[in-house]
């Protein structure tokens, strides 16, 4: 059995690898998710060239149909498989929480027709600002500011919208509604959405800048999540004195629970990789766990159904992967996975219920291969097993298979 001093987990947000067994219980624009396949459809429709992930074994992951442009390796450098989600949801928070060892048996509340008047009126009363009612529905984050940003600049009204996820999002032009005011309003919205019938996973502050027809969302986004309902492996590690480092929106997703070092938000995937590499180089980081989320795949290309952009984003990450590997120590373990799918060729604009890939690499490996198909929480079980903390949670460790 290998024991690693450091484990680095990188979540490629929404990079699914084929419909999950229960995918037809989920849908997009009325179309069941049963034919979704993020990586497969990208590879088939626009081509996919990711030689560095392929070298680890991406093309060796078991599939009914091999990835068209990602060949299997005869001698991969790592271990690979695909993982199934058991929780009742396909959103970011559910996926990440399950990866860290929780099973979400009751999904969060979603509002396909917008938020009820009771919630909107409370926010208006608290903020002293009106809410643009026409925006109160599932909306693309970029489209909603294109459509209502000019009006907000004139009136100072709030743009409140949702998505297929259990989220309430408030968009505000930074020159009209200052950040501290936006954050204060979001904190209030969080306080009134903590229980059913409005149990939301996240409240998201969505600041933006610019002029009409040229608005840009800024890096001052802030997520107000729920704390996990039970201890995750992050808490187990922190309680045992094992350092945990969060890169990107990980700290927000877990509401800071179990995070000992928040390395900040990412401005882009590339910036997130820079931050991860910087984190790996910290002199104090001799033992512990880093957890990185790279969200551009999902936020910029999956929801917008932009297969070419999604492919290019995967290419960009793959080009940076050797830098991550170069920053590893011999007793490090790198795990690359995803939290759900978001097939850019599929119906609708929502996430897709898919298996996610798992790639495992360490400079210390003497073997390679395909691991049994598992579940998201196998990752948390493996991390717990490696650091010798309580594993009384869902998931099965694959640590003893990494040689």
UniProtKB/Swiss-Prot annotation:
Its EC number is 5.4.2.7. Transmembrane segments: none annotated. The keyword Magnesium does not apply. It comes from the Bacteria. The keyword Transmembrane helix does not apply. This is Phosphopentomutase. It catalyses: 2-deoxy-alpha-D-ribose 1-phosphate = 2-deoxy-D-ribose 5-phosphate; alpha-D-ribose 1-phosphate = D-ribose 5-phosphate. It is found in: Cytoplasm. Pathway: Carbohydrate degradation; 2-deoxy-D-ribose 1-phosphate degradation; D-glyceraldehyde 3-phosphate and acetaldehyde from 2-deoxy-alpha-D-ribose 1-phosphate: step 1/2. Mn(2+) 1 binds at residues 13, 339-340. NCBIfam families: deoB, PRK05362.1. Isomerase that catalyzes the conversion of deoxy-ribose 1-phosphate (dRib-1-P) and ribose 1-phosphate (Rib-1-P) to deoxy-ribose 5-phosphate (dRib-5-P) and ribose 5-phosphate (Rib-5-P), respectively. Its main location: cytoplasm. GO terms for molecular function: magnesium ion binding; manganese ion binding; phosphopentomutase activity.
